[in-house]
Each structure stands twice: as C-alpha cells, then as structure tokens.
Regions:
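Active-site helical microenvironments for divalent-metal-assisted chemistry
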Residues: 2-200
C-alpha cells in the first residue's frame, strides 16, 4: 500500500504533493513590480508569505473570524501567477484577471479530490468577497503591497505611485476599524517617506 501524507486535513500521495510544490515553486521565481529594502524585486511567494504572517499576527484582533481560513486563502491567493506571472494592479485588466482565474481553476481541477474541493471552495469564497474572512484577506493583500513600497527605495517608485500609495486599498479596509487604523498608520508612513525622500 502506497504511503499517504496528511497535509492540512488533506490526504495525498507523496508524488501528488511534489507536483503541487513544483507549481508553487514558480511563485519563488516570478517577481512582482515592487522592490525589497535590499534593492531586488520581491517574489510573488514572498508577498503571499507575508500576508499569511500578517493574518497569523492579527488572529486576536478578529476573534470572531476563522483566521486559519484567512491564512489558507492568503497562501493560495496568487497561485494563478505561477502560470501567468504577476501583472501590476495599474496595468491588470479584467481580461487578465479572467485568464488567470481560468488557468488556475483548470489546474485546481487536476488536484486530488480533497485538495480540489478545498481549494475550489477557498477560491470561490475569496473571489465572492462576501465573508469576513475574504475581506480580511483582501485588506491584508492591499496593505502588504503598500507596506513593501514604503520599505523600498523611493527611486523604484513610478510617478503614479505617489498618489496610489495613499489611496490603494482604501475601500478594502472600511469593514474594520482595526484595518482603518492600519491604513491610517501606513499612510502616515507614506507621507513621511515622500517628504523625506522624494527627489526635487
């Protein structure tokens, strides 16, 4: 009898696990628009990891939410970019989003049954943006991007980002007083950075 691995409540064969990890590895290779504080492009995987960390750290701020589910959504939310690469938000079209979603869903449908059902349910909830868990994920997704820009050298910013930094994600934090406070704090940081570092 072939060995099975229990991963997050999902039983799968080691070969199936390795196949999923092989796709996920592409998120380490594919870079995003933003730079890290060390001056290199950040990877999609790094972004996904940090919003997952943010969700873990905020567990006690949202005691009524299923933060384990939020973390799971955060971990897989950009898996489509393993196939398409990252497209900056100010360039991404609805057609790009549909293409990414379709490619990801086609891949999810090839997963072992339990994994397929869980991933499909998480992605459906994520895209519907109706539950508190989905709203928390989306707010963290937006905030992490702004935070990373604040951590990067301002010379890497595009002209449009001076305004975008202050408005990006604003609508996504309105559901939560805590998220509104976080956005306000990040905006203060942004203004200080611009005042200090913006080229003349």
């Amino acid at each position: 009898m072939r060995a099975l691995i229990l991963l997050g409540g999902i039983k799968m064969k080691p070969k199936e696990l390795l196949e999923i990890l092989s796709v996920a590895e592409k998120l380490k290779c594919n870079t995003r628009h933003c730079y890290t504080s060390s001056g290199r492009r950040e990877s999609v995987a790094e972004h996904s990891w940090r919003i997952s960390l943010m969700a873990m750290l905020l567990t006690k701020e949202f005691p009524e939410a299923d933060m384990d589910k939020v973390i799971r959504i955060c971990l897989i939310h950009d898996m489509g970019e393993a196939f398409t690469g990252d497209i900056p938000t100010f360039e991404k079209t609805n057609a790009d989003t549909r293409k990414e979603d379709d490619i990801l869903l086609n891949w999810v449908n090839t997963l072992p049954e339990d994994a397929r059902e869980e991933w499909a349910a998480l992605l459906t909830e994520m895209n519907a943006m109706e539950t508190q868990e989905a709203k928390i994920y989306k707010a963290l997704d937006k905030m992490e991007a702004v935070i990373q820009h604040n951590e990067s050298d301002i010379s890497t910013w595009l002209p449009l980002e001076y305004d975008l930094q202050l408005t990006y994600g604003e609508e996504n934090v309105q559901f939560s007083p805590y998220m509104q406070q976080l956005k306000a704090e990040v905006n203060d940081w942004t203004r200080e950075k611009i005042a200090r570092e913006k080229p003349e």
